[in-house]
Regions:
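Extracytoplasmic c-type cytochrome modules immediately beyond a signal peptide or single-pass transmembrane anchor
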Residues: 20-122
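Generic detector of bulky aromatic hydrophobic side chains
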Residues: 19-20, 137
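Positively charged n-region of N-terminal signal peptides that target proteins for export
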Residues: 1-4
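The canonical Cys-X-X-Cys-His
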Residues: 123-135
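Bacterial N-terminal signal peptides
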Residues: 6-15
Length: 137
């Protein structure tokens, strides 16, 4: 009986500690992504593999933390939820950016900066796609 109560208390504490993903969290993650992109670009200009790798890893870490806007996740109306594909689109963009970040690391390390720069450009396109379609720029 004590074990059950202990597990319930711990489970409740863990649930409460994982607060909802807020707009402030998203802004912080977006700023970290911007810094990571700057770091990758600086690494390209100075032909510095360490900067490129660190920036790509930082970008990958930040993109994994981002989540869809809370108001879309908590949508109560089933029809609006069905018609709204922003959650699916943002998850798809996250996956693509993460893949391209890995490509940047691999290509630049292997001595193919042209392909690494192309992956960087594709990440920028995905960022703009998200900001135009989801964030309504």
């Amino acid at each position: 009986m004590r074990r059950i109560v202990t597990l319930l208390v711990l489970g409740g504490a863990l649930t409460l500690s994982q607060a909802a993903y807020t707009k402030a969290d998203r802004i912080k993650d977006m700023q970290q992504m911007a810094k990571a992109m700057e770091e990758i670009q600086t690494g390209f200009f100075y032909n510095n593999n360490d900067l490129v790798q660190e920036g790509a890893l930082r970008l990958s870490d930040a993109i994994r933390r981002t989540q869809p806007p809370l108001e879309e996740v908590e949508e109560k109306d089933p029809m609006a939820r069905y018609m709204n594909n922003k959650i699916k689109l943002s998850n798809k963009i996250k996956k693509k950016i993460d893949q391209k970040a890995r490509i940047i690391i691999e290509r630049f390390r292997d001595g193919d900066p042209t392909q690494a720069a192309q992956a960087y450009t594709n990440i920028l396109k995905k960022c703009m796609e998200c900001h135009v379609q989801i964030r309504q720029w």
